[in-house]
A protein has these predicted regions:
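Soluble, non-transmembrane catalytic domains of enzymes that act on hydrophobic metabolites at membranes
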Residues: 1-10, 351-353
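Helix-enriched interaction subdomains in cytosolic or periplasmic regions
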Residues: 17-38
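Soluble catalytic domains of membrane acyltransferases
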Residues: 27, 31, 43-216, 232-233, ...
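Short, structured interface segments
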Residues: 214-228
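Cys/His-rich short segments
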Residues: 238-291
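Structural motif
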Residues: 265, 344-346, 378
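Long, charge-rich boundary regions
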Residues: 277-358
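Acidic, Ser/Thr- and proline-rich intrinsically disordered linker/docking segments
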Residues: 365-425
Length: 425
């Protein structure tokens, strides 16, 4: 999938009129039928199945909030298989509307910006649930999982649940990540996919529970490990390309601690600095003599610890020359030139376009980062911005910095929150 783009000067892009808010439309049944038919083609090879738990507690025509984990591009087709012919709106990022705004609205999509405060989104969700009596599907993680475990959820999601006061349904998939992990260069594997569809809470239960209780329940529900699931269920993934791109995720060698010198190719993960090599076996384990890690999420968690130490020591810093695309409307992604992206304990600083662009974003702007691999087949991307404009930054050296930057944003946010919290006496 690609995105419509244009080359335009920075001044002209920033002078473009911003789209006015429009209330979301009730999904057109005919289009949802088309999506359902198309989803059959993708789901048939996965032998998709799902189980429901407690769904009888929800009335047949009662609108609900559907919360689904975000594992791969197949997620929306899974939702169509589960809920069709029930009509539901979908909370979608604004980039998905580029070049197809009307179509997305007719499907029932509600636009929002990833990891940018958006009170309008809450009003739109409330409008669909209360006024249009239409369910709303939302991916609370917002971003795809990098390592097959849950992406951190925004704190106080319970406040949103309390405000909407409708039944909450969760959809947790298994196998969708393993079939098409984000790092694996869009190469699909032969993996069966299943899902658990659960009534997490009725409207009455949402009303009775506290925000903290709802947050805790969500954290428990969105707690999973796709690699562990593969291992425990002895799921065989024997494609010869299964380690392709794994260096995007595991960028730091645990033996020599060199960063950016690891290559994931075929079934091997090799450090070009010290020569240490790991094999990714058919059950998702890493194998090597004197292996530091055998479980991919453990390696990823170790990298998180290393970044935490760098932040605490004041030694962490990212500085990259980047190609810059800006999104200010749904007509196109606008290429405006090049610049420098810096990230340190003070947050992000993006400069470029011959000195015309100078944007800063503090470390408390968001709990995580909008980052992606091979975004719309362009390249690995780091996205920052606000409601006025989103800045898509593509490292010119194609280095493996996306995962590290996301980890750094998450750990820096936690550190700043801790320091900001009042000290109890």
């Amino acid at each position: 999938m690609k995105i419509k783009s244009r080359t335009l000067s920075y001044e002209k892009v920033m002078a473009l009129p911003r789209p006015r808010h429009r209330v979301p439309l009730k999904p057109m049944f005919l289009l949802q039928l088309v999506i359902r038919i198309l989803s059959i083609l993708d789901l048939f090879p996965t032998k998709f199945t799902f189980k429901t738990h407690g769904m009888e507690k929800i009335g047949k025509n009662e609108p609900c909030l559907i919360l689904m984990n975000h594992s791969s591009f197949i997620d929306l087709k899974i939702a169509s298989r589960i809920f069709f012919p029930k009509r539901y709106s979908i909370v979608a990022t604004t980039d998905a509307f580029v070049g197809k705004n009307l179509l997305m609205r007719l499907v029932g999509c509600i636009p929002t910006q990833k990891f940018v405060s958006d009170m309008t989104l809450i009003k739109d969700m409330e409008y669909m649930l209360k006024e249009k009596r239409t369910s709303v599907l939302m991916f609370p993680e917002a971003g795809y999982s990098f390592d097959g475990t849950a992406t951190p959820l925004p704190r106080k999601m319970g406040i949103l649940l309390k405000k909407l006061n409708v039944p909450v349904v969760t959809v947790i998939t298994q196998g969708a990540f393993a079939r098409d992990p984000l790092y694996n260069c869009l190469q699909k594997r032969k993996v069966n996919v299943r899902a658990d569809v659960t009534c997490m809470a009725t409207a009455q239960q949402v009303k009775e529970m506290t925000v903290a209780q709802l947050d805790a329940l969500l954290d428990k529900t969105f707690s999973f490990d796709n690699f562990r699931y593969q291992q425990e269920n002895k799921i065989v993934i024997d494609e010869p390309f299964r380690a392709d791109g794994l260096n995007r995720l595991l960028y730091r060698c645990p033996h020599c601690h060199t960063e950016g010198q690891i290559t994931g190719k075929g079934v091997m993960l090799t450090c070009n600095a010290c020569g240490k090599a790991y094999t990714l076996d058919v059950h998702g384990y890493l194998a090597a003599e004197e292996a530091k890690f055998t479980h991919i999420p453990d390696w990823y968690a170790w990298q998180r610890q290393q970044i935490r130490q760098e932040l605490e020591a004041g030694t962490y810093k990212l500085e990259k020359e980047v190609k810059i695309g800006i999104l200010v409307d749904t007509k196109a992604l606008y290429w405006v030139g090049s610049g420098t992206l810096t990230h340190d304990e003070n947050g992000f600083h993006l400069t470029g376009c011959d000195g015309k662009l100078d944007y800063t974003q503090g470390p408390l702007a968001c709990h995580t980062l909008n980052a992606d691999y091979y975004w719309y087949e362009i390249g690995d991307v780091i996205c920052i911005g606000n409601k006025d404009a989103l800045y898509y930054c593509f490292p010119k050296d194609h280095s493996d910095v996306v995962a590290k930057t996301r980890l750094a944003v998450e750990e820096l946010y936690k550190l700043k929150k801790q320091r900001k919290a009042p000290v109890s006496v």
